[in-house]
């Protein structure tokens, strides 16, 4: 029985799950939901996930949501290839680095992304990118990116010698940040991070390495291909 995955274009959390499914070469049915139409909050979706967020994975009668929970489930149910390590020690390091990313990078990264993409009436016409908080967020991201850069200067992947859950967690966030910093209004802010290939060469090589994985194109946000900047409604959901 095929796995059903419900996701939205541009959601870094849904992207994690798609990367895992492709890496494990698991057959799945893709259900792309439109954030602009609030399809993720429709009655059928709320029946699967009362929080109305993506990703949601349905495997037979079993329903799983929250992206890390989905990755963990997939690795237990379909263990080859492992994405949480093949030993307790490897798994411990992978989980530790994921926790570090979620505690020390992701909140700052998402603050920046939302400030750039936010088109709400309350902030339209303002310049939130010059706020002290956003500057501090960018400083924090740049500092932590150097930690990831140091890891990747010693290994092809963030932890160990194989693609793992930690790569799946971090990669979509970095790609979303890059997309946000390409916006003209983010030019001054972006100099602290962009171009990635110059400021963080090992990180840049890692991004290219992930992009070359089999099945990667099927995980790429479809609306990004049109080169249209996403709105807050498309990218602004909280972690799932």
Regions inferred by a protein language model and the residue ranges of each:
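GST-like domain detector, emphasizing the conserved glutathione-binding G-site
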Residues: 1-135, 240
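A local structural micro-motif
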Residues: 29-31, 160, 218-219
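GST-like fold's C-terminal all-alpha helical module
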Residues: 103-208
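Acidic/histidine-enriched, glycine/proline-rich intrinsically disordered or flexible terminal extensions
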Residues: 220-240
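Positions that flank functional sites
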Residues: 35-36, 163, 225-226
């Amino acid at each position: 029985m095929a796995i059903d995955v419900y996701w939205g274009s541009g959601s870094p959390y849904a992207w994690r799950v798609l990367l895992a499914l492709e890496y494990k070469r698991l057959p799945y049915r893709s259900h792309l939901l439109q954030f602009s139409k609030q399809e993720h909050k429709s009655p059928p979706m709320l029946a699967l996930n009362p929080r109305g967020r993506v990703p949601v994975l349905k495997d037979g009668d079993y329903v799983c949501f929250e992206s890390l929970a989905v990755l963990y489930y997939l690795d237990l149910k379909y263990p080859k290839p492992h994405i949480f390590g093949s030993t307790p020690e490897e798994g411990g390091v992978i989980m530790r680095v994921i926790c570090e990313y979620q505690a020390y990078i992701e909140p700052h990264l998402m603050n920046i992304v939302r400030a750039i993409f936010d088109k709400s009436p309350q902030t339209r016409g303002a310049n939130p990118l010059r706020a002290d908080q956003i500057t501090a967020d960018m400083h924090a991201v740049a500092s932590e990116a150097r930690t990831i850069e140091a890891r990747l200067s010693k290994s092809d992947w963030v932890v160990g010698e194989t693609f793992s859950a930690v790569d799946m967690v971090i990669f979509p966030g970095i790609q979303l940040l890059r997309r946000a910093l390409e916006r003209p209004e983010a030019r001054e802010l972006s100099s602290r991070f962009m171009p990635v290939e110059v400021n963080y060469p090992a990180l840049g090589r890692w991004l290219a390495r992930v992009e070359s994985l089999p099945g990667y194109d099927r995980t790429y946000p479809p609306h990004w291909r049109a080169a249209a900047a996403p709105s807050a409604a498309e990218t602004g959901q909280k972690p799932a």
